[in-house]
């Protein structure tokens, strides 16, 4: 399972996933979407919560996860929702690390 894997160091010369590889890994995730922003493929999901405080707490858990994995997403915190977007900045694309971290985000919700 993806959430049991660890991120590997991703340098500027790492190879981005192909569209086929992205689609295959996406099948292992729930409600994540492949998007493109500024010509960069990204992986995004919106999590919904009952209030701001719960959304804030979840954002903090993602921040801790990001530090543990040394891989950092974009996190948009709003009242009752958190939008998480993963991509590998160094390669301007998607790497397996992005899918691993997406799966770990889902595991954080399940552990609450």
Curated annotation (Swiss-Prot):
What molecular function terms (GO) are annotated for this protein?
A: 4-alpha-hydroxytetrahydrobiopterin dehydratase activity
- What EC number(s) does its UniProt record assign? 4.2.1.96
**Transmembrane annotation, as ranges:** none
Task: Report the SS bond pairs.
Answer: none
Gene Ontology biological process terms, A to Z: tetrahydrobiopterin biosynthetic process
**Catalytic activity line of the entry:** (4aS,6R)-4a-hydroxy-L-erythro-5,6,7,8-tetrahydrobiopterin = (6R)-L-erythro-6,7-dihydrobiopterin + H2O
- Gene3D superfamilies in alphabetical order: Transcriptional coactivator/pterin dehydratase
Keywords for this protein: Lyase
- Report which superkingdom the organism of origin falls in: Bacteria
* InterPro entries linked: PCD_sf, Pterin-4-alpha-carb_dehyd, Pterin_deHydtase
Top class in the EC scheme = lyase
- PANTHER family in the record, alphabetically? PTERIN-4-ALPHA-CARBINOLAMINE DEHYDRATASE-RELATED (PTHR42805:SF1)
* Family in the record: Belongs to the pterin-4-alpha-carbinolamine dehydratase family.
* Name the record gives this protein: Putative pterin-4-alpha-carbinolamine dehydratase
State the organism of origin: Vibrio parahaemolyticus serotype O3:K6 (strain RIMD 2210633)
